[in-house]
Amino acid sequence: MIELCSVEKVFGQLRAVDKLSFKIFQGEVFGLLGKNGAGKTTTIKMLTLQLKPTAGEIFFEGRAIAGNEIFIKSLLGVVPQHLNFDQDLTVEENLELHARLHHMKKSARRERIDELLKFVELERVRKSFVRELSGGMKRRLLIVRALIHRPKILFLDEPTVALDPQVRRKIWELIENLKAQGITIVLTTHYIEEAEALCDRVAILNRGKLAALDTTENLCAGRTLEEKFIELTK
């Protein structure tokens, strides 16, 4: 479980995140929604230890971040919005490099890479250079890379941005399969229907504050999630 307690982040005169308090439960798909500038990216960066909160605390499995950074980082897999592969390495070489960064033994690296490439149906392109892959393949490869060290928590920042509907559905299937394996998933998305389809609960942020937090069913209450989102973020 992840718990945020009165978390704030201030940049100069800008209060990007304002006293956020909520819990993310083990094994759920948790969505963070909000307009541009609502605080989603800043919140994700604090949850993935890329930024330190100005105030408040974040707990992972009951442990505060301070003094537990190595343990907490071992729990996390992060899929960024922007592609950050070495385009001149092959699929296999990129994954091998990342596995080494996690100090995985050679036999374990091989086994895990084979397992994950099969899982996301990228076995046939393992020897291809990353620059040769389609956008959908690169998105799936980002997910594989984040899963290489068997994290318990996976952060997905806009995982289907700029993908066509068919490829987006394939990513959705991957996320559903990961949830079935018991992995906790935290995702940000601009696609309201994506949150509605995938998330057990959704937090809607507005101007750095928590505007709503509930299941998609309870948030909608006879309306669409998009209508509720528009109402809360005016």
Model region roles, listed by residue range:
Residues 213-214:
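ABC ATPase "signature
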Residues 150:
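Conserved catalytic motifs of ABC-family nucleotide-binding domains
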